[in-house]
Amino acid sequence: GXFGPAFHSVSNFAKKHKTA
């Protein structure tokens, strides 16, 4: 994406915690 590592961290966090 365009947001770089910051967005990736949020996406990874959501996947680990299975949140929407």
Swiss-Prot record:
Gene Ontology cellular component list: extracellular region
Top-rank taxon, per record: Eukaryota
Keywords: Antibiotic, Antimicrobial, Secreted
Region annotated Disordered, chain positions: 1-20
Keyword flag Secreted: yes
Subcellular location: Secreted
Tissue spec. comment: Hemocytes and pharyngeal tissues.
Signal peptide: none
GO biological process: defense response to bacterium
General function of this protein: Bactericidal against several Gram-positive and Gram-negative bacteria.
Name of the featured protein: Styelin-B
Species of provenance: Styela clava
